[in-house]
A protein has these predicted regions:
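N-terminal low-complexity, Ser/Thr/acidic repeat segments characteristic of secreted
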Residues: 1-160
Length: 160
């Protein structure tokens, strides 16, 4: 009888250790993601935003049956931080698009530099058309706005 109790105690102890280990791993994963998400800025590629959203969703799915309030609170804080970073990225994209659209004399090199710089600031990559040929600034502007629109659409659809 004493041996049965010792065996039961051993298995209960093992289950407890496994549960503690799982808790620590999940907590570390949330902390790691929080650290990564906090470093996101407007220059970061839009694909990274989508990757982080997918990681958060996986984590959320794995924790849906967990009743630990601390983990759920950390996950909510992580989601909130991500949404704040995403909103900032979308606002920066829309502001850059508006600035590019407001540039009037788009065929001079200063305007082309502004178009290129605004695009670069939000992670859109466009070709700098530096020649004095008329129409190149307009092409740059159209390409920048088109790319920014694609990024906005991708972020709005892919992260909601």
């Amino acid at each position: 009888m004493k041996n049965k109790n010792i065996v039961k105690l051993f298995f209960v102890s093992m289950l407890f250790i496994m549960a503690c280990k799982a808790y620590v791993e999940e907590k570390e994963q949330i902390d790691s993601l929080s650290t990564d998400v906090s470093t996101l800025n407007n220059k970061i590629d839009h694909e990274k935003f989508n990757n982080y959203k997918q990681e958060i969703n996986k984590l959320k799915e794995s924790l849906k049956d967990v009743s630990n309030a601390e983990l759920k609170e950390k996950l909510l804080a992580l989601e909130s931080l991500f949404q704040d970073k995403l909103a900032a990225k979308l606002a920066a994209l829309k502001a850059a698009k508006q600035k590019i659209e407001e540039i009037t004399d788009i065929d001079n090199n200063t305007a082309k530099s502004k178009i290129w710089a605004e695009s670069k600031l939000v992670g859109a990559t466009i070709k700098f058309s530096g020649s004095n040929t008329a129409g190149n600034g307009k092409k740059m502007s159209e390409e920048a706005v088109k790319q920014i629109d694609k990024i906005i659409k991708f972020l709005e659809e892919g992260t909601n």
